[in-house]
């Protein structure tokens, strides 16, 4: 490709509305342009990277035995009504009617469509297992699209769906997809972790997220410093303290705390260790309960894990925090004065709270706290559960090492769906025993456009993008200095351009009438891994300057050796 016949579209300045580095660099490198909120046009350089990512995904999915299909973006509403997700999905599901007033949705995912296809196409267990995938546009009407293509409304996704007649068969495919995803992200040169995850709105049982580690990530990724244990913050288990509860050394005392409505204020005003405080959060109880609310207690320096809390049998789903009015109707005190003593509703305490002694908590009287509370002396120990987020330094749940926490960008997610959708849509086949058998499903997604942004978040410097070789838009940049004035430079540039292309190498020849500084800046911004610079001064010695983008090292290579050298660097 020649720059004179290419839309380079680089920008010198960073657009003001671009928050994260990937968004900034994708705009500056001429990869994308914003059309509307959460909607982007992909320019040639961006498309080249996108296709590289797609091709790696496609190759590994095919290698793992998956079969490619293509399903419509527009889906009839009756399928979503049949699955029950028409009511469940919420405003992210874009709904519309056609000219015949028939309701449709713009697909955010394709479980319903593929299950409908399978229930009409398969009839016998002998046809299974099967795993279908597509690389297709999705649309989710995000309330606040941000970070460029990281959280856009329209995006490209690889989604796969497998069908089975047994859990054992599903597990085999799930393991194959886990391995395929690991190969995909390794081939792309990404630093990632596969972590245990919550199944969320998709549903099902087992689930793993593939997280690219990056400071700008929206997720907290938890992993052991010595073992393979990894989970997202929502699922990571906070194990109970090993040390037994210390004996009481204080009497419980009622203290006036009129200006201490938060843990921070309580700690500051009374010079308390925060680890000796407990905060109490009230949430709505499950429908049909004899109590309207449930009290959840965590240590003052810990955070409630809402996913864990929502899974408690006595707690309503989705998790809903009580309003001050609802709290006062039950407890007769406001949110800043709540605690376990004389709490008139069910109480669930975190494992760490259960190990505390001589602690401080609200007295369920406005402006008052109890100091020196001890379990079983001042109040009976209530139900104990793991309901907090882990923190760095906690022991790993597998008993090996301690936990580290880093930010991550979710680029892939695999689920064991079970029979959630096949039961709802009555997808079954004749089993080996001749009886009708509901199919068991797996679901496997990769955010293709998000992978591009995540790769940049891990691979950049002050000059621009530093692409991993496997997904760079071009492999080699040829920068001929003053080629329009030097016949020797021009002739060699054309010769090398042809020879490298003949070797199957993707080359960008910068044949613009531009200053060298502009040419260098653009190539470094775009992030092409290998650059060769042709200039009369070096050619006098039969030399070409070679530069590797990742480490910035330069070296002189003889003209006759440069093609062989580049082929070896790129192809090994």
UniProtKB/Swiss-Prot annotation:
What domain of life?
Answer: Bacteria
Gene Ontology MF: a single term: proline-tRNA ligase activity
| Entry's Gene Ontology cellular component terms | cytosol
UniProt main location, coarse: cytoplasm
Q: Record's PROSITE patterns?
A: AA_TRNA_LIGASE_II
Q: Which Gene3D superfamilies match?
A: Anticodon-binding domain, Bira Bifunctional Protein, Domain 2, YbaK/aminoacyl-tRNA synthetase-associated domain
Answer yes or no on keyword Transferase.
no
InterPro entries linked: aa-tRNA-synt_IIb, aa-tRNA-synth_II, aa-tRNA-synth_II/BPL/LPL, Anticodon-bd, Anticodon-bd_dom_sf, Pro-tRNA-ligase_IIa, Pro-tRNA-synth_IIa_bac-type, Pro-tRNA-Synthase_IIa_type1
Q: Which reaction does it catalyse?
A: tRNA(Pro) + L-proline + ATP = L-prolyl-tRNA(Pro) + AMP + diphosphate
One Gene Ontology BP term is: prolyl-tRNA aminoacylation
Task: Name the Pfam families on file.
Answer: HGTP_anticodon (PF03129), tRNA-synt_2b (PF00587), tRNA_edit (PF04073)
Compartment list: Cytoplasm
Family note: Belongs to the class-II aminoacyl-tRNA synthetase family. ProS type 1 subfamily.
Report the PANTHER family cross-referenced here. Answer: MITOCHONDRIAL RIBOSOME PROTEIN L39/PROLYL-TRNA LIGASE FAMILY MEMBER, PROLINE--TRNA LIGASE
State how it assembles.
Answer: Homodimer.
Protein's name according to its UniProt entry: Proline--tRNA ligase
The protein's organism comes out as: Escherichia coli O157:H7
**Encoding gene, per UniProt annotation:** proS
